[in-house]
């Protein structure tokens, strides 16, 4: 999400050059942004408080920044923030809104309202440094031939993932009329998707076969991406592709809908008052039944791709 905000920020401020400091494997997310230098770091080289002091010294020496923006606000960046402030740098930090998140995820709160989107919170960091930013809230469709549908059926946490039997049935139905491409990561996910590919004609498993840059390019070439509330939804935004997103214990009210993606393309159980019970999907279901996922009908997804065409699972 940050990459799209940074791109628009830099477009609106041609006088600014930005140094993005993050883990090396995120470099491909920022490659196409003019006037951005990506500084990849290995956290193993900067352990503990002394490691953060070492990193801060290296960054100050190499880049001599005018100001510092913290878009993450985690333990490591909190240490860096303090070090840079002690050195006299102006530092702006994202406000994650802990209190409003707690109110939103209170299962007894029956009057839940959307909180400020994460992309606007990113933009606020730059605004607080004196740079006005107006976000378009639109992703940019790449000028490529689009065909096929992508399906990323996995998520990091149980509370965000449609039951695999539902995703499998969805794949079986969609592959009758569309070329279908599976996305995933890790050995277990790859093995499952390989099995699906063998069982379902007109499908291709891409899990474990592409670099991040290649994955972004493939997503850009898709007509539609189907994803859980996961990184693949945000990759679709970065690649300029419409994404139908599935939400379980999480909710787009928390501000994490993919940049430029439409609420109309959200699939969820609307009338469950306990949702969202979690911001990241990492909490156990207090009901014990994960109704937020079990009650999703895959026809909801099919209707957004093939309006008016009813499909029924084989007995």
Task: Please provide the spans of the model-predicted regions.
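Catalytic machinery of carbohydrate-active enzymes
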Residues: 1-315
């Amino acid at each position: 999400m940050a990459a799209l905000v940074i791109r628009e920020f830099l477009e609106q401020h041609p006088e600014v050059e930005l140094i993005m400091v993050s883990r090396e494997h995120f470099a491909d997310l920022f490659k196409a942004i003019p006037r951005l230098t990506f500084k990849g770091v290995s956290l193993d080289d900067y352990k503990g408080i002394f490691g953060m002091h070492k990193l801060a010294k290296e960054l100050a020496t190499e880049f001599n920044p005018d100001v510092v923006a913290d878009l993450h606000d985690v333990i490591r960046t909190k240490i860096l923030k303090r070090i840079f402030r002690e050195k006299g740098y102006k530092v702006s930090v994202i406000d994650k809104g802990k209190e409003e998140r707690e109110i939103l995820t209170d299962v007894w709160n029956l009057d839940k309202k959307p909180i400020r989107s994460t992309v606007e919170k990113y933009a606020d960091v730059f605004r607080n440094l004196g740079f006005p930013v107006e976000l378009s809230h639109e992703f940019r469709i790449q000028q490529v031939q689009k065909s096929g549908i992508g399906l990323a059926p996995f998520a990091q946490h149980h509370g965000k993932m449609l039951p695999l039997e539902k995703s499998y049935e969805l794949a079986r139905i969609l592959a009758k009329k569309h070329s279908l491409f599976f996305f995933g990561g890790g050995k277990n996910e790859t093995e499952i998707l390989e099995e699906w590919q063998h069982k379902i004609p007109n499908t291709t498993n891409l899990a474990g076969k592409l670099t991040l840059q290649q994955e972004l390019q493939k997503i850009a070439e898709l007509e539609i991406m189907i994803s859980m509330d996961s990184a693949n939804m945000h990759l679709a935004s970065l690649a300029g592709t419409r994404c139908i997103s599935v939400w379980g214990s999480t909710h787009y009210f928390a501000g994490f809908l993919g940049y430029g993606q439409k609420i109309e393309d959200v699939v969820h159980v609307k009338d469950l008052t306990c949702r969202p019970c979690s911001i990241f999907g990492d909490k156990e279901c207090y009901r014990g039944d994960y109704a937020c996922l079990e009650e999703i009908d895959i026809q909801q997804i099919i209707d957004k791709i093939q309006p008016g065409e009813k499909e029924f699972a084989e007995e």
